[in-house]
C-alpha cells in the first residue's frame, strides 16, 4: 500500500468530497487518448488499463479504516475506475462481503463504460457518487478532441437517468474552447449542461477552458498550426478562466463568455431542480432565524445556492451579501438583498478583506452570518469561518445544499 507512516493519508483527504474520504487507486492507466489529456502522452508510455487485485484493494480499505476511525469513505481518484465491468462488480461484492459497505465511495469513471448491473452492485456497496468527463455536447468537437468511444451522449443520458433511480449522485467535467470548437458548437455544451442540471441529473460540475498542456497532442497541434502566442505566459495554462489558444474564427473573448455561460447554465438548472428539496427543508430549518434579523450572507458557493438561500429567507430578514467583485456582479439585481459588499478578488480570508470593510461590517451588528457549504466535513471553509468570526455577529450558521441550517462553533472574540 502507499506509505502511511510519517505522512498520514487521513490528513490529506480530498476536500472536494462530501465526506471525509481518503484517496485510493484501484487501477492504473487509461485506454483512451483524448488530445488534451496528459495521461496518454506523459503519465504512461502506452494505452492500457491495469486493475489491482480486488482482495488487495479491500484490504487497503480495511487497514485505513482500522487506523483512522474518523475516515468516512474512499475516493477512487484514478484515471478511470470502470473500464472492466467484471472488476467493478467483483470489487463491489468484495466490499460488501468484508462489511465495509457502510463507508461512502466515490470514483472517477467513464460514463460510456457505465453499466446497469455494475451500477446496482456499486450502489449496494456504498458508492454514492460517480465523477466523469462529459467534455463537450458537440459531436464535431468530440471528434477533434479524439474522445473516441468515450463520447456517447445517448449513453450519458440513459446511464445517468438509471443511476438517479438508484440514488446515485453525478459530478461532470466539461471544457470550453477545445479543438474544433466555435460559438455554435460550444453553445451545444452550454445547452447540455442546463438540460442535465435542470433535470436533476447533474449534482456538481467542473468547467474548464480547454488548455493545451505541453506534451499533449492538443499542444502539438497548436504549435503546428500557430495557435499559441509567441510570448507565452505559463501562468495562464491552468484552464481556470484564462484563454491561451488563439483561433482565427473563435476569439478568446467569446471562449471566455461561453465558459461563464456554462457555469451560469449549471446554476440556473441546478436551482430549478433543487428548489423543491431545499425549500421543503428550509421551511423548518430557517426558523432558526427570527423575523427582522440582520443577516450577512457570504458568497462562498455557486450562485444557485445563494439564490435559494435568499428566496427561502423570504424577506423575513434584512440581508446583505459579501463576495468577490466578479461573483457579486451576477447577484446585484436579486430580490431580498439590501446591500452587496465586494472585497476584490481571491479566496475568502481575513487577509483579503480590507480593514475598513471589516470595520463597516462590524458596525452593522449582524445577528447572523450565513456560510453556505458544499460538503459535510467543512474542509476548505476554515478561512470563511475566520472571516465570519472577524465580523463579530451574534451567531454563525452553516447552510447545507439540502436547505438545512446548523450552528457553527462559538464566535472567537
Can you say where each PLM-predicted feature lies in the sequence?
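Nucleotide-activated donor-dependent transferases that construct or modify glycoconjugates
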Residues: 281-302
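Conserved C-terminal portion of the radical SAM core fold
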Residues: 65-66, 70-77, 102-106, 125-134, ...
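Active-site and donor-binding regions of nucleotide-sugar-utilizing enzymes
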Residues: 296-310, 315-412
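C-terminal accessory regions of radical SAM enzymes
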Residues: 4-11, 16-17, 21-23, 184-282
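Radical SAM [4Fe-4S] cluster-binding motif and immediate context
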Residues: 2-170
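Structural motif
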Residues: 73-75, 129, 294, 367-370
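Histidine-centered beta-alpha loop that forms part of the nucleotide-sugar donor binding/catalytic region
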Residues: 110-111, 135, 175, 210, ...
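Conserved residues at the C-terminal ends of beta-strands
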Residues: 40, 77, 133, 208, ...
Amino acid at each position: 500500500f502507499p506509505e502511511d507512516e510519517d505522512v498520514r493519508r487521513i490528513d490529506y483527504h480530498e476536500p472536494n468530497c462530501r465526506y471525509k474520504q481518503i484517496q485510493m487507486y484501484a487501477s492504473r492507466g487509461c485506454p483512451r487518448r483524448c488530445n488534451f489529456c496528459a495521461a496518454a502522452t506523459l503519465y504512461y508510455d502506452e494505452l492500457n488499463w491495469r486493475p489491482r487485485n480486488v482482495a488487495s484493494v479491500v484490504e487497503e480499505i480495511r487497514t485505513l479504516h482500522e487506523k483512522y476511525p474518523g475516515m468516512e469513505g474512499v475516493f477512487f481518484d484514478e484515471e478511470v475506475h470502470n473500464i472492466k465491468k467484471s472488476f467493478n462488480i467483483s470489487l463491489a461484492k468484495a466490499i460488501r462481503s468484508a462489511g465495509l459497505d457502510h463507508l461512502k465511495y466515490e470514483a472517477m469513471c467513464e460514463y460510456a463504460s457505465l453499466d446497469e448491473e455494475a451500477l446496482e452492485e456499486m450502489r449496494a456497496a456504498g458508492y454514492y457518487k460517480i465523477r466523469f468527463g462529459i467534455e463537450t455536447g458537440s459531436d464535431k468537437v468530440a471528434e477533434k478532441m479524439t474522445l473516441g468511444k468515450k463520447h456517447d451522449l445517448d449513453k450519458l443520458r440513459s446511464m445517468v437517468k438509471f443511476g438517479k433511480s438508484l440514488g446515485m449522485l453525478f459530478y461532470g467535467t466539461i471544457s470550453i474552447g477545445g479543438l474544433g470548437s466555435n460559438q455554435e458548437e460550444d453553445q451545444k455544451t452550454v445547452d447540455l449542461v442546463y438540460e442535465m442540471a435542470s433535470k436533476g441529473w447533474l449534482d456538481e460540475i467542473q468547467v474548464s477552458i480547454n488548455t493545451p498542456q505541453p506534451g499533449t497532442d492538443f499542444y502539438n497541434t497548436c504549435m503546428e498550426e500557430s495557435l499559441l502566442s509567441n510570448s507565452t505566459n505559463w501562468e495562464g495554462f491552468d484552464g481556470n478562466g484564462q484563454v491561451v489558444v488563439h483561433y482565427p474564427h473563435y476569439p478568446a473573448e467569446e471562449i471566455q463568455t461561453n465558459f461563464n455561460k456554462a457555469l451560469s447554465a449549471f446554476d440556473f438548472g441546478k436551482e430549478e431542480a433543487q428548489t423543491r428539496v431545499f425549500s421543503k427543508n428550509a421551511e423548518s430549518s430557517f426558523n432558526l432565524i427570527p423575523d427582522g434579523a440582520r443577516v450577512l450572507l457570504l458568497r462562498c458557493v455557486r450562485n444557485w445556492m445563494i439564490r435559494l438561500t435568499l428566496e427561502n429567507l423570504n424577506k423575513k430578514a434584512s440581508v446583505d451579501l459579501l463576495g468577490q467583485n466578479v461573483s457579486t456582479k451576477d447577484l446585484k439585481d436579486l430580490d431580498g438583498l439590501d446591500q452587496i459588499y465586494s472585497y476584490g478578488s481571491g479566496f475568502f480570508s481575513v487577509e483579503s478583506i480590507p480593514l475598513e470593510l471589516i470595520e463597516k461590517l462590524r458596525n452593522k451588528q449582524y445577528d447572523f452570518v450565513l456560510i453556505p457549504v458544499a460538503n459535510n466535513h467543512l474542509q476548505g471553509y476554515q478561512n470563511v469561518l475566520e472571516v465570519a468570526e472577524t465580523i463579530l455577529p451574534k451567531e454563525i450558521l452553516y447552510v447545507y445544499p439540502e436547505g438545512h441550517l446548523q450552528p457553527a462553533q462559538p464566535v472567537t472574540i
